[in-house]
Amino acid sequence: MARTKSTVIARKVTGGKAPRKQIGSKAARKSAAPSNTSGGVKKPHRYKPGTVALREIRRYQKSTELLIRKLPFQRLVREIAQDFKTDLRFQSSAIGALQESVEAYLVSLFEDTNLCAIHAKRVTIQKKDIHLARRLRGE
């Protein structure tokens, strides 16, 4: 038995307007297509909102490298240390250990912040979620 192309497409129901039916025939669409390619400029490809974000989440969850650049972090540490004592020197391993612990703290804070946003039935984290997460931690 030969396979035929099914015209029924499963769609996720998100509310809003119902999809419109295609009225034009194949011949009408073929005649309209060449005018678009010859005169118009092709739009650059864009992913749906959220697709790139999900891809980045998967990418960074797989990786183990440091996400904050080393030199800007080192300058920040030296600037903060300058307030306590002048002419302090740091071993490179000390800066690396500080950076590891800072990134671990931030990742853990954002995980708790995300849980606070989900608890409020949202997917976007807000400033108040960070405040709540820190308060629950006792910070």
UniProtKB/Swiss-Prot annotation:
Region described as Disordered: spans on this chain: 1-48
Modified residues (N6-acetyllysine): K12, K17, K21, K26, K30, K42, K62, K70
Cellular component GO terms held in the UniProt record: nucleosome; nucleus
Compartment(s) where it occurs, according to its Swiss-Prot or TrEMBL record: Nucleus; Chromosome
Repeat among keywords: no
N6,N6,N6-trimethyllysine modification, residue list: K5, K30, K42, K85
Keywords: Acetylation, Chromosome, DNA-binding, Methylation, Nucleosome core, Nucleus
A GO biological process held by the record: rRNA transcription
One Pfam family linked to the record: Histone
Chain positions found as N6,N6-dimethyllysine: K5, K17, K30, K42, K85
Quaternary state and interactors: The nucleosome is a histone octamer containing two molecules each of H2A, H2B, H3 and H4 assembled in one H3-H4 heterotetramer and two H2A-H2B heterodimers. The octamer wraps approximately 147 bp of DNA.
Family (UniProt): Belongs to the histone H3 family.
Name of the protein this chain belongs to: Histone H3
Species of the source: Yarrowia lipolytica (strain CLIB 122 / E 150)
The gene coding this protein: HHT1
